[in-house]
Amino acid sequence: MKKRALVSVSDKTGVVEFVKGLLEQGIEVISTGGTKKLLEANGLQVIGISEVTGFPEIMDGRVKTLHPNIHGGLLAVRDNETHVIQMNELGIQPIDFVVVNLYPFKETIAKPDVTFADAIENIDIGGPTMIRSAAKNHQFVSVIVDPVDYDVVLAELKENGEVMDETKRKLAAKVFRHTAAYDALISNYLTEQMGEESPETLTVTFEKKQDLRYGENPHQKATFYKAPFAATSSVAYAEQLHGKELSYNNINDADAALSIVKEFTEPAVVAVKHMNPCGVGVGTDIHEAYTRAYEADPVSIFGGIIAANREIDKATAEKLHEIFLEIIIAPSFSKEALEVLQSKKNLRLLTVNIEKATSASKKLTSVQGGLLVQEEDTLSLDESTISIPTKREPSEQEWKDLKLAWKVVKHVKSNAIVLAKDDMTIGVGAGQMNRVGSAKIAITQAGEKAQGSALASDAFFPMPDTLEEAAKAGITAIIQPGGSIRDEDSIKVADTYGIAMVFTGVRHFKH
């Protein structure tokens, strides 16, 4: 008996060549709808699905393969005598190959003008049913859902006259990954349409972007996956123009740098090391912004990651070229800038859209045995809700410095303290177990520049000791959430030293 293949694909990539190869191996091909028309238009002889089922395609193609003659042929265990007898009695012939990919649901809902009806119509029913049946019976059926696998299958058929068992198992595993991802997209779309924020089960799907050489350390394996609908303003959707392959740590640091630089509408440059900012500068142009980011911490920037929210021009590229950097990420690079920077063969150059994230974005954090899901912290300073509990209000320049420090501090590991002055950070205290410890680090880093600077704290001061350290350093303005039971103690210290203090009412912990 001739072997038979059922071919019905929405992604027509390579299908004509593949079916031609199947026919050359003496395999009969059954097909449906648009796939059948394409194959016949290319001179290939195929059998219509209705000839197998004895039933026409109905309901605009919604029902065409949901038939015992199809699923019996897929699910029958060929060495089971009872199955064989039933097939013979009912006139069911085995199907040995299934070549199916599914209706383009993801592409449909990605369209800005998609309607709910369009989305529903692109939920495939027959396709998933067929490939799941075939994958369950993979001992006897080869099921191909990805055009990438066409060549492998044809090569084994030509060499061995059949598809190897190991390949069948791999193809079956891919089917269930494929259908799981497909169903996850559908369930997530419908969940969002209903406005459900915390469903009883959460199913997420990601697509492999690349294998990484190793993870955070050389002994750890790692892979980079991207979300199917991630914001284009992300490292996952960045275009690499030059340099070595991105590492696990590169991706983390680039993500952190990009998150910070999105906070600014004016020209801004951010330097990051180990996911914490070491220098942030703003200016009238990107060259001035970079100069300030560099001067913020010329030691730590070495080997760092740079993110800019404007095109990198030649003058800025020449300054960047002077030091060792891992990555530069920007909306674009001028032709002259690329010529300068590409002389460093390992320097990674990435382009990406710079758009501030919205609260609709979700942040997923894995913990042992579970997953934490929260909204991204995209909240900006709302001047209509702040309060100034001190006798003195910030000056115009102090306000400018406070706003810069506040934008940055929410991206620093808690406990976090940031000092800013004259359109740049001058000290960053990150990740200490007590707040005053972070303040001391930031003040020490700033040195004499701390005099007349502004300080931002990601959370309230539990005690006035941080205020006292700030006063000793000559800091003149502070922004913090407030809300401590000892706020009055901090206010008294601030008033004693003439420090202007702003309460935002918003905390920005980052762990």
Swiss-Prot record:
**What pathway is it annotated to?**
Purine metabolism; IMP biosynthesis via de novo pathway; 5-formamido-1-(5-phospho-D-ribosyl)imidazole-4-carboxamide from 5-amino-1-(5-phospho-D-ribosyl)imidazole-4-carboxamide (10-formyl THF route): step 1/1; Purine metabolism; IMP biosynthesis via de novo pathway; IMP from 5-formamido-1-(5-phospho-D-ribosyl)imidazole-4-carboxamide: step 1/1
- Give the organism the record lists: Bacillus cereus (strain G9842)
The Swiss-Prot or TrEMBL record describes its family as follows: Belongs to the PurH family.
Q: Which Pfam families match?
A: AICARFT_IMPCHas, MGS
What does the record say about domains? The IMP cyclohydrolase activity resides in the N-terminal region.
Single annotated GO MF: IMP cyclohydrolase activity
Q: Which reaction does it catalyse?
A: (6R)-10-formyltetrahydrofolate + 5-amino-1-(5-phospho-beta-D-ribosyl)imidazole-4-carboxamide = 5-formamido-1-(5-phospho-D-ribosyl)imidazole-4-carboxamide + (6S)-5,6,7,8-tetrahydrofolate; IMP + H2O = 5-formamido-1-(5-phospho-D-ribosyl)imidazole-4-carboxamide
Coiled-coil region(s) at which residues? none
GO BP annotation list? 'de novo' IMP biosynthetic process
- Domain MGS-like, chain residue ranges per copy: 1-145
Q: Which keywords belong to this entry?
A: Hydrolase, Multifunctional enzyme, Purine biosynthesis, Transferase
Q: What is this protein called?
A: Bifunctional purine biosynthesis protein PurH
Q: What is its EC number?
A: 2.1.2.3, 3.5.4.10
- This protein's GO CC annotations: cytosol
